[in-house]
Amino acid sequence: MKLTSEKLPKNPFYASVSQYAAKNQKFFQWKKEKTDYTHANLVDKALQLLKERILKGDTLAYFLRGQLYFEEGWYEEALEQFEEIKEKDHQATYQLGVMYYDGLGTTLDAEKGVDYMKKILDSPCPKARHLKFAAAYNLGRAYYEGKGVKRSNEEAERLWLIAADNGNPKASVKAQSMLGLYYSTKEPKELEKAFYWHSEACGNGNLESQGALGLMYLYGQGIRQDTEAALQCLREAAERGNVYAQGNLVEYYYKMKFFTKCVAFSKRIADYDEVHDIPMIAQVTDCLPEFIGRGMAMASFYHARCLQLGLGITRDETTAKHYYSKACRLNPALADELHSLLIRQRI
């Protein structure tokens, strides 16, 4: 399973680019006078402002310019900026760790990425403190994936527990969610631990864990079965953009014979573009691409089944084949599993 890096944590002592710019009188006046500005205009103006501050010796402006490049997807420029200040700015060091590990703006070098994250985790400097939980999560990811270090689930678990910090909302919520996923997929499974960590992460706002909790309630995994609680979690997660929760709601509607509702809901999900929408949704929701694809595959399969049998929609076997094929492309293993249920007339 391919995981994703923890985004740069917010530092209460550092302003963001937008906050930094908003406090600048020249920038504020420019926005007031120019009412038809675009995003590109704002970026250009922010870069101009940051350049002026850099020339005046503002050390924070160096990092903020690199971060602006990073957020705009100009990774080569961001890398160059962060490399210049890595010895003076822990946030730059952190971002370099992410960029080398994920190959953003440079050739992928997982070992170098791991080294930068270890520097953050081992740093005694108070200015690195807010980065330590996130660095521990990223190091746990490296051990889990076996990239840059020798693979070790035990070391990954140890680091994620450090990062999760007993459910602290100011720690790595991503690590809390990952522990929920880890305990529910390892052998042997530890479902009560999985439920605990998904509950902690969900309480701290994690969208992936909210959907996972819904499924654990629905099937009585690690907790007593509770359909009402399951549907509440799944619906709220679906409304917030969790595609895997959406796919599982489609399955629930089909099994409950709410075919009209199933068709309407499944079509919207099944029509997501598998190439462009999955990475975009992952970026916006911070959900894992694998589960986004799984949710889309589930919706595609059930939409195809409704079309094939004329359930809640006019029968159309040609279009049904299109959606069956899409389900197979998105997740062959899931499509095969659902096809087996279909053959046994379970769906």
Curated annotation (Swiss-Prot):
Pfam families on file: Sel1
Sel1-like repeats: 93-125, 133-168, 173-206, 207-242, 243-277, 297-332
Alphabetical keyword list: Cytoplasm, Repeat, TPR repeat
Keyword Repeat applies: yes
Complex formation: Interacts with LRP2.
PANTHER family documented for this protein: LRP2-BINDING PROTEIN (PTHR44554:SF1)
Protein name: LRP2-binding protein
Organism of derivation: Homo sapiens
